[in-house]
């Protein structure tokens, strides 16, 4: 007797590999043996059917989020899992904390939720990424000079701004420019380490700098 839901090619006994035709792609026929390119439909996206040849855009469901299914076409809201963090899946909509891997550190992924130490690379230095855990020398760009990014490792010439002049960020390299009187020699930057010969400005003559 022919099954009423699986088309004329499927028998009552189940979906054998030789019977997996396009007309057999229904939930009741989605078994491990039925994972073929012609069977990649939303109704067939079950855990037993998550194979590379079934990873099409229509098959990106929560039950199909496996490493073998992480392709460019599978970057959707239902595919945000660590095992899916591959280079082809680095898109803004995929940037969640669980997906912050070295292969996913791209400018499009530089969001607040994706600012982890392992994601601190030069291409990921955006204002939204200036958190304490992301303050590394390679992230000290002009756009990244925020108060919460003023760490000793961030004291480079491009990061010497008033907003970065905190006690932990007052290094000699922040006092070497002629404009240091209004940049590095800020009220919060009166530290002995900042008073060098190239920065003898009256504005720097605080009691702690004498």
UniProtKB/Swiss-Prot annotation:
This is Keratin-associated protein 4-9. It comes from Homo sapiens (Human). The keyword Glycoprotein does not apply. Interacts with hair keratins. Sequence repeats lie at residues 24-28, 29-33, 34-38, 39-43, 44-48, 49-53, 54-58, 59-63, 69-73, 74-78, 84-88, 89-93, 94-98, 99-103, 104-108, 109-113, 114-118, 119-123, 124-128, 129-133, 134-138, 139-143, 144-148, 149-153, 159-163, 164-168, 169-173, 174-178. It comes from the Eukaryota. PANTHER family: KERATIN ASSOCIATED PROTEIN, KERATIN-ASSOCIATED PROTEIN 4-6. Belongs to the KRTAP type 4 family. In the hair cortex, hair keratin intermediate filaments are embedded in an interfilamentous matrix, consisting of hair keratin-associated proteins (KRTAP), which are essential for the formation of a rigid and resistant hair shaft through their extensive disulfide bond cross-linking with abundant cysteine residues of hair keratins. The matrix proteins include the high-sulfur and high-glycine-tyrosine keratins. The gene is KRTAP4-9. It holds the Pfam family Keratin_B2_2.
């Amino acid at each position: 007797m022919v099954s009423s839901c699986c088309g004329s090619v499927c028998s009552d006994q189940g979906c054998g590999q030789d019977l997996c035709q396009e007309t057999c792609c229904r939930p009741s026929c989605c078994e491990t043996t039925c994972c073929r390119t012609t069977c990649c439909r939303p109704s067939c996206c079950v855990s037993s059917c998550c194979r590379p040849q079934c990873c099409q855009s229509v098959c990106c469901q929560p039950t199909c989020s496996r490493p073998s299914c992480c392709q460019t076409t599978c970057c959707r809201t239902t595919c945000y899992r660590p095992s899916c963090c591959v280079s082809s899946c680095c898109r803004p909509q995929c940037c969640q904390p669980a997906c912050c891997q070295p292969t996913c550190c791209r400018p499009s992924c530089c969001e607040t939720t994706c600012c982890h130490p392992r994601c601190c690379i030069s291409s990921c230095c955006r204002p939204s990424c200036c958190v304490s855990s992301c303050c590394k020398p390679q992230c000290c760009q002009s756009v990244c000079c925020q108060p919460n990014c003023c760490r000793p490792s961030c004291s480079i010439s491009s990061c010497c701004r008033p907003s970065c002049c905190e006690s932990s960020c007052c290094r000699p390299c922040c006092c070497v420019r002629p404009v240091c009187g209004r940049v590095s020699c800020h009220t919060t930057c009166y530290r002995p380490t900042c008073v060098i010969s190239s920065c003898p400005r009256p504005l720097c003559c605080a009691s702690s700098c004498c």
